[in-house]
């Protein structure tokens, strides 16, 4: 058992029951080079429909009109504020696989002053930070974002914040930490 599994509040289920869960283990291992800790700790204990819900979030993300980099910036910002180590790790893993600008993701904590971020991105990230941290948004923060984004894009940003919280709270609530997916992604490149 590796260290990420040893720290979880519930023990990882290494040998799942049921065909659907065995398939979930196989396909996550195939995609990531390992069975993800949330699958072994959380999904394995619930009916398959719960796991499919998480998959549906990913499918819905593909329907977003926001640039893919912005989608990952929003998700990373939420995970960073909530301190979801697993979510930060898997998000960065996806950005590495997609050959996105890693310096920009490294500078996310300083987005307000970093030259790597546009005013448009700063406006969205301010909104995301306020909503995530305070569970409330000042009208002026919303207005600043609304100058840069369409109504649909604003709703997409809200969707990203809300759906990222589902992932974050699942992992934080079970003390699930990084699976070192960034390291695996770098080795694949």
Annotate each language-model stretch with its function:
Residues 151-188:
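Preference for long, well-ordered alpha-helical segments
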Residues 48-53, 83-87, 131-139, 161:
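Short acidic alpha-helix initiation/capping motifs at coil-to-helix transition points
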Residues 119-159:
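Acidic/histidine-rich alpha-helical segments that form the ligand environment
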Residues 71-92, 164:
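Short, thiol/selenol-centered motifs that function as redox-active sites or metal-ligating centers
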Residues 46-49, 88-107:
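Iron-sulfur (Fe-S) cluster-binding segments and ferredoxin-like electron-carrier domains
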Residues 1-68, 96, 189:
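Mobile cap/lid helix-loop segments that border enzyme active or cofactor-binding sites
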Residues 73-78, 108, 124-132, 157-168:
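Short alpha-helical scaffolding segments that buttress acidic/His motifs in well-ordered protein cores
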Residues 108-119:
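Acidic/His metal-coordination segments adjacent to aromatic residues that form catalytic metal sites
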């Amino acid at each position: 058992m590796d260290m990420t599994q040893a720290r979880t509040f519930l023990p990882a289920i290494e040998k799942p029951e049921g065909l659907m869960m065995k398939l979930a283990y196989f396909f996550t291992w195939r995609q990531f080079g390992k069975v993800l800790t949330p699958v072994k700790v959380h999904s394995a204990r619930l009916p398959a429909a719960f796991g499919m819900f998480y998959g549906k979030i990913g499918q819905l993300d593909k329907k977003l009109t926001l640039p893919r980099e912005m989608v990952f910036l929003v998700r990373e910002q939420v995970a960073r504020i909530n301190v979801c180590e697993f979510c930060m790790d898997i998000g960065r893993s996806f950005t590495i696989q997609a050959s996105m600008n890693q310096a920009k993701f490294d500078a996310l904590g300083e987005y307000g002053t970093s030259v790597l971020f546009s005013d448009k991105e700063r406006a969205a990230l301010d909104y995301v930070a306020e909503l995530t941290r305070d569970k409330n948004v000042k009208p002026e923060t919303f207005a600043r974002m609304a100058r840069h984004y369409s109504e649909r894009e604003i709703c997409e940003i809200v969707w990203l914040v809300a759906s990222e919280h589902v992932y974050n709270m699942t992992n934080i609530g079970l003390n699930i930490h990084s699976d070192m997916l960034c390291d695996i992604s770098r080795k694949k490149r």
